[in-house]
């Protein structure tokens, strides 16, 4: 699983011009599910996102997580995070999960995240969406469970 996490002042999703979801201060999470992802990746990724201290404390230091600020999350499915652009001029998406697996894992990710964060909103799976956001910082972090599962490197 891959996620692009953006700290936002606000974010919203529209489908066909109709407002579907919106949040104020919190995180916009663009979520990609790969064909080799496993169910354990859901918890690994969600727990990492919840625990990331990327919000500023009273001294301006990134020291608070999303729950510390009573923030919201907006989750938007995005299979294009698994684009392979090594060859040709058109991205190859064969590393993305098929739609059945992707929908299943997406729903499970959202439900698990709801158990960890008070306010979680969603986009519409497989829909063409207009995503609007006001970045805060900007702070943008890319997470990949393939990397998160590797052992930490030792400092030498």
From Swiss-Prot:
Keyword annotations of the record: Cytoplasm, Hydrolase, RNA-binding, tRNA-binding
A biological process from GO: D-amino acid catabolic process
Enzyme Commission number(s) of this protein: 3.1.1.96
Top-level taxon of the source organism: Bacteria
Cell location: Cytoplasm
UniProt keyword annotation of Magnesium present: no
One Gene Ontology term, aspect cellular component: cytoplasm
The keyword Hydrolase belongs to this UniProt entry's keyword annotation: yes
Motif Gly-cisPro motif, important for rejection of L-amino acids location, chain numbering: 137-138
Pfam families given in the database record: Tyr_Deacylase
Catalytic activity: glycyl-tRNA(Ala) + H2O = tRNA(Ala) + glycine + H(+); a D-aminoacyl-tRNA + H2O = a tRNA + a D-alpha-amino acid + H(+)
Entry GO MF terms: D-tyrosyl-tRNA(Tyr) deacylase activity; Gly-tRNA(Ala) deacylase activity; Ser(Gly)-tRNA(Ala) hydrolase activity; tRNA binding
CDD domains reported for this sequence: Dtyr_deacylase (cd00563)
Matches recorded under NCBIfam families: D-aminoacyl-tRNA deacylase
Function statement: An aminoacyl-tRNA editing enzyme that deacylates mischarged D-aminoacyl-tRNAs. Also deacylates mischarged glycyl-tRNA(Ala), protecting cells against glycine mischarging by AlaRS. Acts via tRNA-based rather than protein-based catalysis; rejects L-amino acids rather than detecting D-amino acids in the active site. By recycling D-aminoacyl-tRNA to D-amino acids and free tRNA molecules, this enzyme counteracts the toxicity associated with the formation of D-aminoacyl-tRNA entities in vivo and helps enforce protein L-homochirality.
Family the UniProt entry places it in: Belongs to the DTD family.
Cross-referenced PANTHER family: D-AMINOACYL-TRNA DEACYLASE 1, D-TYROSYL-TRNA TYR DEACYLASE
Subunit structure and binding partners: Homodimer.
Domain notes: A Gly-cisPro motif from one monomer fits into the active site of the other monomer to allow specific chiral rejection of L-amino acids.
Descriptive protein name: D-aminoacyl-tRNA deacylase
Lineage: Bacteria, Pseudomonadati, Dictyoglomota, Dictyoglomia, Dictyoglomales
Protein's gene: dtd
């Amino acid at each position: 699983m891959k996620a692009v996490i953006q700290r936002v002042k606000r974010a919203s999703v529209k489908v066909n011009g109709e407002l579907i979801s919106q949040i104020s201060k919190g995180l916009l999470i663009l979520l990609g599910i790969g064909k080799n992802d496993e169910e354990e990746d859901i918890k690994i990724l969600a727990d990492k996102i919840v625990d990331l201290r990327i919000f500023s404390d009273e001294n301006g230091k990134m020291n608070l997580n999303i729950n510390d600020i009573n923030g919201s999350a907006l989750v938007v499915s995005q299979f294009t995070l698994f684009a392979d652009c090594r060859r040709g001029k058109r991205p190859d998406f064969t590393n993305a999960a098929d739609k059945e697996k992707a929908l299943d894992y997406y729903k499970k990710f959202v439900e698990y995240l709801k158990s960890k964060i008070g306010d979680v909103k969603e986009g519409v799976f497989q829909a063409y969406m207009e995503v609007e956001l006001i970045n805060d910082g900007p702070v943008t972090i890319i997470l990949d469970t393939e990397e998160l599962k590797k052992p930490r490197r030792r400092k030498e």
